[in-house]
């Protein structure tokens, strides 16, 4: 940042830009790592949102890996690229306007939105603060729309890969689903119990958390995110994913998926045990989830879909190659 300011608006040379961009990427990578620590352990983020402010977001991988033949062609490539600052992207998302940035920047911005949701849910005024909740929901919806205009990347995707586009966007989607869910359902008590590996505490906290998973129109949208999370594994093959994902998937997926599977299990349990009959939308979602699993899974775990989801997800995490 200081080097950029010292240039007084002049474009950097290729060598100068590489040095600056390397620093930015390292800084943002640490920011994402701290975001995952907050997700996992509910630690207060070590890097403040305000530290980025006027810092440019990471460039596209194409520009980062570009081997320019001369300074002139390099400057042309830099001028043609869309690089905005963290603050510009943040403000644009909260205004409901789509923002164009790189795949790496996409991952950075969903990390920022996740942390804003985390702070909001820890605020004493969270229950009454419907304005902030509306703004966060708008920003998340705009972030998802912005994927359509993300900086194009030339990336080779293996046929066996669970995603069709850039792997960073695949990882960002895991964080997005979790953030959408956390905005509606706060499972802090369950998360705390899971940290200490006491099965009785976990069972008690999940029983008490049932009422937090409402049967509402808004909850159906969250359950859709849960469906998309487990669908990735189901379409690839539950057992195959369980045995290979720890070595070739990013850690975001099991960490973010854990909350979603707890919410999904509690929602299914309520649907199966509540006296209130299921609505048409709830039944449609229930059947959509049921169709993801083969008959063998149902035979092993019984007819209750909540049991199937809980046991299958647990068996995936507790496979031969486990997540560290």
Regions flagged by a language model, labelled:
Residues 1-92, 148-161, 195-198, 238, ...:
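Acidic, Ser/Thr-rich, low-complexity intrinsically disordered regions in fungal proteins
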Residues 2, 78-94, 98-275, 281-300:
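Long, amphipathic alpha-helical regulatory blocks in the mid-to-C-terminal portion
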